[in-house]
């Protein structure tokens, strides 16, 4: 699951972010946004384009960032995620992870409003092309 690899990468490379592979602690999560702590990053996969014969897939990933009542907190994290992932090529995000061919941001951080507690939320979306070998794809 590429979202897990992106979440682990964010936890390692982005200021004030930490990822726990068990999903219990830290503030970076896969497809869930707990009520606390205030500052959270949720990483989710959604749709993508698959080549029927070539061994590559384009996977869409969203990083949704919730900050505090100060909009700059969440924005700064979302912007750092954007800055660090945009344009990344020919690498793996984690050891023994998927081979990333390229990362293309779909947008700069977008303000999606506040949650019920007045905490600002931001999203940034990426299209990530990965090497994806299957039985009929080589």
Segments the model singles out, each with a brief description of its role:
Residues 58-62, 79-80, 138:
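Short intrinsically disordered coil segments
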Residues 34-35, 53, 113-118:
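Short, ordered beta-strand-loop transition motifs
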Residues 16, 86-136:
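Acidic-leaning, charged glycine-interspersed low-complexity segments
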Residues 51, 71-73, 132-136:
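Residue-level signal for secondary-structure boundary sites
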Residues 55-72, 120-130:
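Oligomerization/assembly interface segments of phage tail-like spikes and tubes
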Residues 1-52, 88-96, 136-138:
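Small/polar-rich, solvent-exposed N-terminal microdomains that initiate assembly or binding
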Residues 69-93:
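Mid-chain, well-packed structural core segment of small domains
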Residues 2, 73, 118:
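Conserved acidic
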């Amino acid at each position: 699951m590429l979202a897990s690899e992106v979440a682990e990468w964010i936890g390692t490379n982005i200021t004030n972010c930490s990822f726990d592979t068990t999903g219990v602690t830290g503030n970076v999560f896969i497809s869930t946004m707990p009520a606390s702590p205030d500052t959270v990053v949720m990483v989710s996969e959604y749709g993508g384009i698959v080549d029927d014969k070539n061994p590559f897939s384009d996977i869409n990933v969203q990083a949704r960032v919730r900050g505090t009542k100060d909009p700059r907190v969440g924005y700064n994290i979302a912007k750092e995620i954007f800055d660090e992932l945009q344009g990344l090529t020919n690498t793996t995000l984690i050891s023994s992870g998927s081979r990333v061919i390229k990362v293309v941001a779909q947008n700069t951080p977008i303000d999606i409003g506040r949650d019920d507690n007045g905490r600002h939320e931001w999203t940034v979306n990426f299209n990530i092309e990965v090497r994806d070998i299957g039985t009929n794809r080589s």
